[in-house]
Every structure is written in C-alpha cells, then in structure tokens.
Amino acid sequence: MNNRRKIVVIGASNVGSAVANKIADFQLATEVVLIDLNEDKAWGEAKDSSHATSCIYSTNIKFHLGDYEDCKDANIIVITAGPSIRPGETPDRLKLAGTNAKIMSSVMGEIVKRTKEAMIIMITNPLDVATYVVSTQFDYPRNLILGTGTMLETYRFRRILADKYQVDPKNINGYVLGEHGNAAFVAWSTTGCAGFPIDDLDEYFHRTEKLSHEAVEQELVQVAYDVINKKGFTNTGIAMAACRFIKSVLYDEHTILPCSAVLEGEYGIKDVALSIPRMVCADGIMRSFEVHLTDDELEKMHKAAQSVRSALDGAGIK
C-alpha cells in the first residue's frame, strides 16, 4: 500500500518555513520539499527541520531542498513566495499586487510544465489577486486552486470573541468573508456560540458591557499589522490555516471552510477571487456556499470585490 504524501512548499522564508514545520507537527506528509531562490536558506530550513525528526515525538518525514521538478509527483503545492508587508509600511496588501502578480506568473509557469494534478494552496499576498492570477492565466483546473483567504481572519475573529466571552474559540461559529485584507468583513449573521445567536451571547455569558461589533471589526483588521510591527512578520496563524486546508484535502474531509477562489456569479460577482464558504476535499474545491447575508454584509462583499478588481486593473490583469 502506498501511503506516500509529498508536499512542496515554494518560498522558504518566515511563512514557508512555518508551514513546513506545522506540516511535520501534524504529521501531514511523508516528504516535504522546500524551494526558494535563496537555495542556502531553503537548504538550511530543510536541514533544521529534518534534525527535529529524530525526536521521539516526531514522525520520520523526509525534508529536503528541491526544485520545480519535485512538483511532478507532488500531492500538494503550497505557494508562499513573494515580498510581504514589513514593519512600518503602509498596511495594504493590495499595493503588492503588481510585483507579486509577476512572481506568481513565473512560479506557475514552472509548475504547469510539470503537473496539473497537484492541489495548489496559495498564501502569497495580496492573496486574492495572486489566487485570481493563478486560477485564470494558466489553464490549471480551478477546483485544484484555493487561497487561504479569510481563514486566518476567521481564526482571529473567533479568538477575539472567545476572549470576550471566556469560552473555547472552537465553540465560536461564524465567518469573516470577502478580501484577505482591509476589505475583509465579519458576517455577523453567521455568528453564534453553543447554539445561541450572536445577539444572545451577552446575556447568556453574563457580559456587563454590550459587545461592540464595530470595535471587534476594528481590532480584527488592526491586529495583523500590530503583530507585524511588534514581531516583524506573521507566520504561525497562517501556517495553521494552510495546514487546515492540507488536512481536509489529504483526508478527503469535505470540510466547509472560508477560502479564496474565483467567484462565478455568487452574490452577483464575477472576475475576482474572494473568500466565501467552500467545501474542500480530496478533489479540491467541491462546491461553494452562497450563505445568506444581510443587506449590509452583501454591500461589504461587493466593496471587497471592487477593492480586489481595482488592484487587478492597476496591475493590468483582466
């Protein structure tokens, strides 16, 4: 029986190395390949991770430096390559659009020479622009391309609410949708805990102060840049988000998760990639869910689409 599971991670900097190590932590692969223009960095990260496999608690995963030839027989390819926002910079991922779109074109040009069967998980920012480019420019099966999208914002949102109500964040339901970035929005109409809708939680959890939706939304957008400015980068949360998708694919879980892909008429939107709930399984994205949104939430979804389309137009991407 062949239980081989090969994952290629393109980009070995802060995010790529974190993804590789979380893959090992959760025993999601038998082989992890790191590819980077800086081969010394990729070699060092792979070697460091391989040393950890000697620990009694670790799985004997093969870590190594690779190249695009490794994509031929990969099950999953995770793309993290490209510059990101640095401490002190203007907090707008969309300003990276032109630069990273060119990088994605180069990376995908190499991948499609070797495979059109691997699941591709996008992390590179601006995430929705990168996902759109990869999905529309290379005749790669769209169901096999997803961006981590607002999965990370959803994790952050659930943590914020959990802290306010003193409950396990895994008991919080609800999505952050739209753009992975400044135009992300909380779909409050999907939010609740333990079977109670969001509007009942203050009373049920005995909060003395009414929850401010606006304050939560502001914190949700700002916290990523606070982490960047204080830590220098974000990598742990996004690595966990990527591994959630990897697990759903490898175990054919049919999990419904918010992720980025090209919209094909959902909410009356086309020709942009945005995050909405989608079912993810061994065949990639199996279906999308046009969950009911309030008029205000629907307006925010369309504003997110306009934001991403503006970035695409600015980069000359149709």
UniProtKB/Swiss-Prot annotation:
The keyword tRNA-binding does not apply. GO terms for cellular component: cytoplasm. NAD(+) binds at residues 13-41, 125. It comes from the Bacteria. Keywords: Cytoplasm, NAD, Oxidoreductase, Phosphoprotein. The modification Phosphotyrosine is found at Y225. It is found in: Cytoplasm. Gene3D superfamilies: Lactate dehydrogenase/glycoside hydrolase, family 4, C-terminal, NAD(P)-binding Rossmann-like Domain. It is an enzyme of class 1 (oxidoreductase). The active site is at H180. GO terms for molecular function: L-lactate dehydrogenase activity. Its EC number is 1.1.1.27. InterPro entries: L-lactate/malate_DH, L-lactate_DH, Lactate/malate_DH_C, Lactate/malate_DH_N, Lactate_DH/Glyco_Ohase_4_C, NAD(P)-bd_dom_sf. Substrate binds at R93, N125, R156, T234. Belongs to the LDH/MDH superfamily. LDH family. Homotetramer. NCBIfam families: L-LDH-NAD. This is L-lactate dehydrogenase.
